[in-house]
A protein has these predicted regions:
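Secretory targeting and sorting signals
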Residues: 1-34
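Catalytic cores of phosphodiester-bond hydrolases, prominently lipid phosphodiesterases
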Residues: 2-3, 38-54, 71-74, 78, ...
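Beta-loop motif signature
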Residues: 61
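A structural motif detector for short, solvent-exposed N-terminal "entry" segments of globular domains
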Residues: 65-70
Length: 313
């Protein structure tokens, strides 16, 4: 079965071409002049490192790993999370304000390396992949001031970052989504944005367009009592499936935080129920653990890689 990327995170071919030309320059111009009678590139292929990017893999607090961004990419993740604080004019990345360091910024840890990666991989974060990696920017400091700084910075990367103009999405290799202290009023008023808005379950049914709110995230423990031990109660399973269906019907992707993350059977049980329901992103600090689970237990990833699904543990 041919695997198709989530529609909301697939790069249109014209956007890919524009990105390649802008980022790679003369090399891309030469490539563009070559004959176009070759077969179309598959929707999803292995990267130059032999990895298939994992559609559901979200690196929670990614910056706490030994190699921020790069560890996640080496495990095939397609969504990474960075907490930011506006300090002395810099967007510093850390979980707590006391842990911020000058120079350890959104640009140095994420935007500049991603731009270089896209140049190296000829227009995509993963070679041959037509998707967009999600950069979830969790604003920890004052919302309006920090978003203004984030917006100024993202506009310096027009060929890297997805933008929305007049409600229309122009996909690029990286898509920023603002979480945490979100300045919804300013974001709503912008005619051109370089970031989407991370909604909550309370936003479902409000008619908010996916062009503004591409992602909905919420705290698992505030919605469900089940934490993976024993069978999932049928009422909670039905609730999860309803939430997924409602999110997808509106064009949103869905993520939960505060899910169990110790390497136990409870974590795998919760991940399996989430995959079965169609939750779009699984939240973890354990990069290797989630990669192993998705490559062996997720039918979507198994089909994409062309290998049989392993039996559940």
């Amino acid at each position: 079965m041919t695997y198709l990327l989530k529609t909301s995170r697939r790069l249109p071919s014209l956007a890919i071409a524009a990105t390649v030309l802008a980022l790679v320059g003369p090399l891309a111009t030469v490539a563009a002049a070559a004959p176009s009678n070759e077969p179309a590139t598959p929707a999803r292929t292995a990267s130059s490192r032999g990895l298939w990017p994992l559609e559901r893999a979200h690196a929670h607090n990614d910056y706490e790993h030994a190699r921020p961004l790069f560890d996640a990419l080496d495990h095939g993740f397609t969504s990474v999370e960075a907490d930011v604080w506006l300090q002395d004019g810099e967007l510093r990345v850390a979980h707590d304000e006391s842990a911020t360091q000058p120079g350890r910024t959104l640009q140095s840890l994420y935007l500049d390396p991603l731009r270089q990666r896209v140049r190296t991989e000829h227009g995509s974060v993963y070679a041959g992949w037509h998707g967009s990696v999600q950069l979830l920017i969790d604003v920890k400091s004052d919302g309006p001031a920090t978003y203004a700084a984030v917006d100024r910075v993202l506009r310096q990367y027009p060929d890297l970052m997805t933008r929305w103009t007049g409600g229309r999405e122009h996909m690029r290799p990286v898509t920023a989504v603002i979480s945490g202290n979100r300045d919804r009023e300013v974001m709503t008023a912008q005619t051109t944005r370089y970031a989407g808005y991370d909604g909550r379950l309370s936003d479902l049914g409000t008619g908010t367009p996916a062009s503004f709110m591409p992602l909905v995230s919420d705290n698992w423990t505030q919605q469900f009592t089940w934490l993976g031990v024993g069978p999932m109660p049928s009422a909670e399973r039905e609730k999860l499936h309803r939430i997924v269906a409602q999110s997808h019907a509106a064009g949103y992707t869905l993520r939960f935080w505060a899910t169990p993350d110790l390497a136990t059977s409870a974590r795998e049980s919760l991940w399996r129920e989430s995959v079965a329901a169609g939750v779009d992103y699984l939240n973890t600090d354990d990069l290797a653990g989630l990669e192993s689970f998705l490559r062996t237990q997720d039918p979507q990833e198994s089909r994409a890689q062309g290998r049989p699904l392993h039996a559940a543990a």
